[in-house]
């Protein structure tokens, strides 16, 4: 049922090769020269957002972040290290890295993703419409 709901809501977006602002480092393919030029993943993002930061730097350097439906993997987020929500120290680290991402790349740049429709909700992961269409410009 969830898969059917996703297909209806995303209008088959996930079946299309397309540009994204960032993808997960769990499945990231990048030219060595680009990785080296940008000095790889920023180790100051010890757990969270190192992939997002890297992708944003790749994009700022003039390269594209391309997502393809033809690569398939299973990624169990936080499976090996556990949830950040249940551990106050992990939660604090996550929150600090979140704020650092805003500081490095600008809050507005993060919140106004050029590859994500402003008519879609940021509160859900299933491409449902935003309840506040005033955000459209």
What are these language model-derived features?
Residues 1, 40, 77-80:
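Glycine-centered small-residue hotspots that permit tight backbone geometry or close packing
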Residues 3-8:
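Short, small-residue-biased leader/transition segments that mark boundaries at the very start
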Residues 9-12, 83-84:
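Short amphipathic alpha-helical surface micro-motifs
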Residues 12-39, 44-74:
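A short, conserved alpha-helix in the catalytic core of glycosyltransferases
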Residues 59-137:
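Active-site-adjacent helix/loop segment of glycosyltransferases
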């Amino acid at each position: 049922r969830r898969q059917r709901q996703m297909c209806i809501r995303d209008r088959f977006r996930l079946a299309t090769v397309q540009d994204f602002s960032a993808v997960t480092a769990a499945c990231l393919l990048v030219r060595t020269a680009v990785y080296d030029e940008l000095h790889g993943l920023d180790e100051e993002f010890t757990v969270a957002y190192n992939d997002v930061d890297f992708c944003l730097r790749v994009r700022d350097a003039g390269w594209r972040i391309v997502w393809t439906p033809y690569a398939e993997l299973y990624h169990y987020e936080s499976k090996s290290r556990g949830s950040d929500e249940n551990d106050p120290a992990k939660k604090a680290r996550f929150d600090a890295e979140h704020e650092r991402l805003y500081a490095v790349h600008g809050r507005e740049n993060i919140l106004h993703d050029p590859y994500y429709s402003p008519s879609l909700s940021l509160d859900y992961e299933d491409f449902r419409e935003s309840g506040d269409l005033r955000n459209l410009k």
